[in-house]
Regions:
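Structural motif
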Residues: 76-82, 117-122
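Residue-level detector of high-confidence beta-strand sites
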Residues: 70, 94-96, 134-136
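Short coil/loop residues immediately preceding or within conserved phosphate-binding loops
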Residues: 49-54, 78-79
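Acidic/hydrophobic-patterned starts of short beta strands in beta-sheet-rich repeat architectures
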Residues: 61-72, 105-112
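Extracellular C-terminal loop/segment signatures of secreted glycoproteins
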Residues: 81-103
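Acidic, small-residue rich beta-repeat scaffolds with periodic aromatic anchors
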Residues: 3-10, 14-45, 103-164
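Acidic, divalent-cation-chelating loop motifs in proteins
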Residues: 54-62
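Mature extracytoplasmic domains of secretory-pathway proteins
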Residues: 64, 71-76, 86, 91
């Protein structure tokens, strides 16, 4: 985990985003029912959506890709994603994230911008069938779009919660 923490810190300090995950548009009728169900039904009806974005990525290092499915939620800080893991031939939702997603080997880096002067970077993995945030880095900037870092706050998750 230290290597990933250092990698995310390098991104934060350099202002250069890591490589985004590849999205693929998949029609709802071509995905398993449990996967299509994560897209908010009211939003789906309002938008008359017939498909959604899907990302495949190994989040736990078992060489079996999990599915990240756009759930219909979006805003200035990114979009909502449901994370599903395959077990016994079916997909099961293990968690949700909101933000901009990036590659990290295995695991998931999520950037959540908040206005022009702040952003939170989080690293997630799957443990015991649940999506777990292992650390968060909150950064305040003096200039917009990730320039001139003013402060960095790092919270690392341990057994009892986050520590500073």
């Amino acid at each position: 985990m230290n290597q990933i923490l250092l990698r995310v810190l390098a991104v934060v300090l350099s202002g250069v985003s890591p490589e985004p995950l590849d999205e693929k548009v998949v029609p709802f009728n071509e995905m398993p029912v449990e996967c299509a169900a994560v897209y908010d039904a009211d939003i789906r009806q309002f938008r008359q959506a017939t498909a959604t974005e899907v990302i495949t990525s190994d989040l736990d290092g078992d060489k079996i890709p999990e599915l990240l499915i756009f759930n219909g939620e979006n805003g200035s800080g990114g979009v909502g994603w449901a994370v599903l893991q395959k077990a016994n031939g079916k997909y099961r939702k293990v968690g949700d994230v909101f933000g901009i997603l990036y590659k990290s080997g295995y695991g998931l880096i999520v950037e959540s911008p908040c206005g022009w002067a702040e952003a939170t970077w989080s690293y997630y993995t799957i443990e015991h069938g649940k999506l777990v945030c292992k650390f968060e880095i909150t950064v305040k900037y003096s200039k917009p779009i990730r320039q001139e870092v003013v402060s960095i706050k790092i919270k690392v998750k341990n057994e009892s919660g986050f520590t500073k």
